[in-house]
């Protein structure tokens, strides 16, 4: 039986499709506001959103909030954000490349 009150959102879009990057954070924040335990798992190109320096200058909409602002909002809402170990390898990244808002690495790769 699935965990009641827990929501997991998988993020696969990255900087190459910025218009898709804000929505997962909205969904996670809504889930957290509804008293659910919310977590986000960043896979494939989504892992790049957790790379230092990437989200600061990335915008889903011109003149809107940066993706880093969405990441900070999620942190304030106690959303847990983790990256897939295979996605780290795919992008030649290590844990040292990750922003401090990232809660760790999951997976067996």
Per-segment meaning from a language model:
Residues 1-4:
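Basic/polar N-terminal segments that are highly enriched at the extreme N-terminus
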Residues 21-40:
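Histidine-anchored nucleotide/phosphate-binding helix
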Residues 8-11, 39-43, 50:
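Short, conserved beta-strand edge motifs with alternating hydrophobic and charged residues
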Residues 46-60:
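N-terminal beta-loop-helix "entrance" segment that forms/cooperates
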Residues 8-22, 54-55:
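Short, glycine-rich nucleotide/cofactor-binding loops
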């Amino acid at each position: 039986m699935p965990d009641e009150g827990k929501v997991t959102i998988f993020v696969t879009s990255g900087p190459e499709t910025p218009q898709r990057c804000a929505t997962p954070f909205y969904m996670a924040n809504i889930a957290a506001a509804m008293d659910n335990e919310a977590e986000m798992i960043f896979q494939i190109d989504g892992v790049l959103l957790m790379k230092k320096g990437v989200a600061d200058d990335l915008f889903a909409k011109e003149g809107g909030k940066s993706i880093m602002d969405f990441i900070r909002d999620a942190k304030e809402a106690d959303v847990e954000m983790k990256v897939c170990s295979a996605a780290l390898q795919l992008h030649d990244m290590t844990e040292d490349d990750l922003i401090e808002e990232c809660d760790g690495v999951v997976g067996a790769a």
